[in-house]
Amino acid sequence: MQFYELNSSRMDYRELSADDLDLLTPLLRSEETMQTLGGALSYEQTLDWLVDTLRRYQTEGCGWQLALDKPTGVPAALCGLTYEQVGAERVLTANCIVRHELRGIGVGRECIAACLLYAFESMHADEVSAFVQKDDLAGLHTAVACRMQPTEKVSHIAFGKTAPCVRCVVRNPHLAEKAEAENEPSEDKKSTET
């Protein structure tokens, strides 16, 4: 059962299944790919991560997805929307892990843009956050390219490891447009003012 669907020009996205453990190896179990997230996961950690992702589909209606290169069908990235607890606040986050050999060609930006589009148009989210590890300049560039603004430095737990991160946030652009439209005087009001 597909809980939610992302779309973009170069990638096909699909939810993970219990049968996808082997497809996660070039992503989560790769030292190069996971270097900014504290290193490769073990088999057991990868299995736990997959189980947590499957649980999130059921309980949150969203979670990580596999991004497949359209021409080749090769896994290019993991991305998706998850809910994270930040203090007393529950925030929707956009996440992306790009295979190391595919970095620098816009895969991360395309994945995050697809996540944001879904969050704002289908989930009607007010805002989306991303937690970028402080040493991950490529991740920060991707967030900023997707109009996310760095807002604060936080300690964030990812893959069982706490790391210093920058929280980046983007507000739903549709809400800003709606607020502007509500604040503009109507034509009737304009004509009575003159």
Regions inferred by a protein language model and the residue ranges of each:
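Sparse recognition of residues in long alpha-helices and their boundaries
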Residues: 40-41, 62, 89, 159
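A short helix-loop-beta-strand connector motif used in the catalytic cores of GNAT acetyltransferases and
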Residues: 53-66
